[in-house]
Amino acid sequence: MDMLHTILNFLLPPLTISFLVLFYPFYLFTKLMSCLKHLHFENVTGKVVLITGASSGIGEHVAYEYAKKGAKLALVARRKDRLEIVAETSRQLGSGDVIIIPGDVSNVEDCKKFIDETIHHFGKLDHLINNAGVPQTVIFEDFTQIQDANSIMDINFWGSTYITYFAIPHLRKSKGKIVVISSATAIIPLQAASVYSASKAALVKFFETLRVEISPDIKITIALPGFISTDMTTPQFKEMYGSDFILSESVSRCAKAIFRGIGRGEAYVIEPSWIKWIFLIKNVCPEIVDYLLDYIFVSYLKPYFKRD
């Protein structure tokens, strides 16, 4: 068996290079055909869309994009008062029917309730937007208790997987879509976000695998936004990283990009799009990205984590 690995180590590099040279033109052609296909935009008028974390941030503004196109909305979050405001705004923007379902995505029974109430009210489900999430603003060793990290994984990862589990039978019937809001930190490490980054990376790998399992019945779009001006960029977060240091994008612009990606059936939405090039550098020359992150941490961030 070791001999087989030795042979593969020797053969695969030249074979891979040859493959890329020979088939790259064909790849470009298929990408062009894919772009032409994406000129078609899905009509979401009358479609039923369930959005978690809809009380603020990306979830709120994605709801507004759907509302403008006449979609019917089921809005989920813990803050009922905020949901009511988002629901009313969505109605004014053009949504014909909006319900709110307060609850916690980290609770399995609540996740079942979200789906059950949506089906009871609308009779179907077309799109599931997994957006609910919480941030992290301390380095790993500065957690007061390690158990405090559990809630990040429970909400950011398990919250999306729980509700997806209950939604799949209904999405199969409607040939629907699942959208998951991950983060650029799933690919590029961010200081003081170790558990947060892990939760977002877990989302990417889970839904990439699920995409294989449930295709072609259900389509999956994975969004990887960078720094976005939402409630998650808390005053503590902005103070730590510095408002000038963070190249934050408006939440409305990000939501529009995600909505366009959903409508075009894109597998991934990376916003802002320049982050794609950082991902490329990370894949080709990971040491360069690691060096830059180390430099940024030592030069800008380390003073915030010094202990008494």
UniProtKB/Swiss-Prot annotation:
Q: How does it sit in the membrane?
A: Single-pass type II membrane protein
Check the record and name the InterPro entries matching this protein: NAD(P)-bd_dom_sf, SDR_fam
Q: GO MF annotations for this entry?
A: oxidoreductase activity
Q: Where mainly found? A: membrane
Protein's recorded name: 11-beta-hydroxysteroid dehydrogenase-like 2
**Which residues are listed for substrate binding in this entry?**
183
Sorted UniProt keywords = Lipid biosynthesis, Lipid metabolism, Membrane, NADP, Oxidoreductase, Signal-anchor, Steroid biosynthesis, Transmembrane, Transmembrane helix
Its cellular-component GO annotations read:
membrane
**TM region positions:** 10-30
- Name the catalytic site residues: 196 (proton acceptor)
Question: Main EC class of this protein?
Answer: oxidoreductase
- Record EC number: 1.1.1.-
Q: Which family does it belong to?
A: Belongs to the short-chain dehydrogenases/reductases (SDR) family.
Instruction: Identify the species of origin.
Output: Arabidopsis thaliana (Mouse-ear cress)
Write out the residues that bind NADP(+): 53-79, 104, 196-200
GO BP: steroid biosynthetic process
Q: Where in the cell is it found?
A: Membrane
Q: Does the keyword Aminoacyl-tRNA synthetase apply?
A: no
